[in-house]
């Protein structure tokens, strides 16, 4: 008998970088509602701790995460690989790029500000990795995905 462990996706555990979002209720009233930054339980203590850490701290390397948890990088990488199907470094990359996407779609922050907030050493590195992953520059992504009235829809 084989037991399959369901893989956890970035979207399932991602914690928004936004502070509030405009919500319209059934009666048609619109109101800025705070976004819940609590961890959505994944069923894994390791994953929940990792997501909390990535949300609160600007960590760039898997070794930094392993040091924080006082674990060997190899052991932590193996656990994340079992839980997500990807290495710790790949998970961290995709998690940070998800943050970049959200900032691009919902804010007027510059590439330099976004790269700093997402833990990149500079905007060139962020842009290179973004292009490599999504096949377009951050500016092109922003142009294609940010609504005209973004500043009325989101608070960051």
Model regions: which residues?
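Short alpha-helical elements of helix-turn-helix
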Residues: 40-48, 91-98, 123
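…primarily DNA-binding HTH/wHTH and HhH modules…
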Residues: 3-28, 32, 36-39, 128-156
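Short hydrophobic/aromatic patch on the recognition helix
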Residues: 76, 80, 125-126, 130
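Terminal helix-turn-helix DNA-binding modules in bacterial transcription factors
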Residues: 82-118, 144-156
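DNA-binding recognition helix and immediately preceding turn/loop
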Residues: 34-87, 107-117
């Amino acid at each position: 008998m084989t037991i399959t462990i369901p893989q956890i996706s970035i979207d399932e555990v991602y914690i928004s970088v936004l502070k509030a979002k405009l919500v319209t209720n059934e009666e048609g009233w619109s109101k800025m509602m705070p976004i819940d930054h609590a961890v959505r339980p994944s069923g894994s203590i390791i994953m929940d701790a990792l997501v909390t850490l990535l949300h609160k701290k600007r960590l760039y390397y898997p070794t930094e995460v392993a040091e924080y948890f006082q674990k060997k990088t190899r052991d932590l990488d193996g656990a994340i690989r079992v839980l997500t199907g990807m290495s710790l470094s790949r998970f961290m990359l995709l998690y940070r790029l998800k943050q970049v996407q959200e900032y691009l779609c919902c804010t007027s922050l510059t590439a330099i500000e976004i790269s700093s907030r997402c833990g990149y050493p500079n905007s060139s590195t962020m842009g290179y990795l973004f292009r490599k992953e999504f096949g377009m520059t951050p500016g092109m992504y922003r142009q294609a995905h940010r609504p005209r009235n973004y500043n009325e829809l989101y608070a960051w």
